[in-house]
């Protein structure tokens, strides 16, 4: 793992030099602020929490994560760059982790830029900052899980339109799973519904979003991240044979 920091810094610099990064982060922050202020009832309730604001994140991440994911492996799909990477003493795990962590940091920066809403909530009323902290952590974990999915899809193909369709389609499917569960509740066997509930990241996020940051739910997101990063590493190893 000696070269992991090198990969991390290189990807972070790549994001910093790409105008699309700033556009996607700005769009995420502005939409968070606009929708959070206009649709959240917490302004009327004395600013006690940011519950509705955080409920928007699974949908807003569809824009941000998709944009960041498409930049992860774009350079390495170039034959010259791919051949050069083969000559360097860099393992696939280092490449995957370094790039993923850099993208996750950008997500964290975008999330941190929504902090003024926390200031507003505290100004308007007695906000529960412990719950808000838990909500921010939950949102960060959700972003990491979405990003790991995008990382895997981008390792499969270099065609941006295919990446866009697959990433958006898969993340939309995941995001709408809870709605499908409501429809299946009285039509499917209970064990099927329970199994799908256990796999639904939105319901998990909803639990964390309520301020209940349990080890069980946190491990779910960590496991999802590790699973898709492992799948990404396997895919890259197969393609570089």
Each model region followed by its residue ranges:
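Aromatic- and glycine-rich beta-strand/loop motifs that create alpha-glucan
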Residues: 1-23, 241
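Pore- or pathway-lining transmembrane helices of multi-pass membrane proteins that form conduits
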Residues: 21-28, 160-178
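Secretory targeting signals
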Residues: 34-37, 44-47, 53-54, 60, ...
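Terminal transmembrane helical anchor/hairpin motif
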Residues: 41-42, 47, 51, 166-235, ...
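Long, hydrophobic alpha-helical segments
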Residues: 53-75
């Amino acid at each position: 793992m000696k070269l992991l920091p090198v990969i991390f810094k290189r990807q972070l610099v790549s994001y910093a030099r790409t105008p699309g990064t700033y556009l996607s982060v700005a769009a995420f922050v502005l939409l968070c602020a606009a929708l959070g202020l206009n649709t959240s009832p917490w302004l009327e309730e004395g600013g006690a929490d940011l519950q509705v604001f955080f409920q928007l994140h699974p949908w807003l991440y569809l824009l941000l994560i998709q944009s960041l994911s498409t930049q992860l492996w774009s350079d390495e799909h170039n034959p010259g760059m791919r051949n050069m990477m083969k000559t360097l003493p860099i393992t696939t795990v280092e490449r995957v982790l370094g790039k993923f962590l850099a993208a996750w940091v950008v997500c964290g920066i975008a999330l941190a830029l929504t902090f003024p809403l926390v200031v507003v909530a505290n100004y308007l009323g007695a906000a529960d900052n412990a719950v808000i902290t838990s909500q921010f952590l939950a949102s960060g974990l959700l972003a990491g899980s979405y990003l790991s999915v995008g990382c895997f899809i981008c390792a499969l193909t270099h065609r941006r339109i295919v990446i866009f369709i697959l990433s958006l389609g898969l993340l939309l499917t995941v995001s709408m799973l809870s709605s499908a569960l409501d429809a299946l509740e009285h039509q499917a066997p209970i064990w099927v519904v329970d199994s799908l509930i256990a796999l639904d990241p939105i319901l998990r996020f909803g639990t964390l979003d309520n301020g209940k940051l349990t080890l069980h739910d946190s491990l779910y997101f960590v496991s999802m991240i590790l699973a898709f990063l492992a799948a990404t590493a396997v895919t890259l190893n197969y393609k570089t044979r």
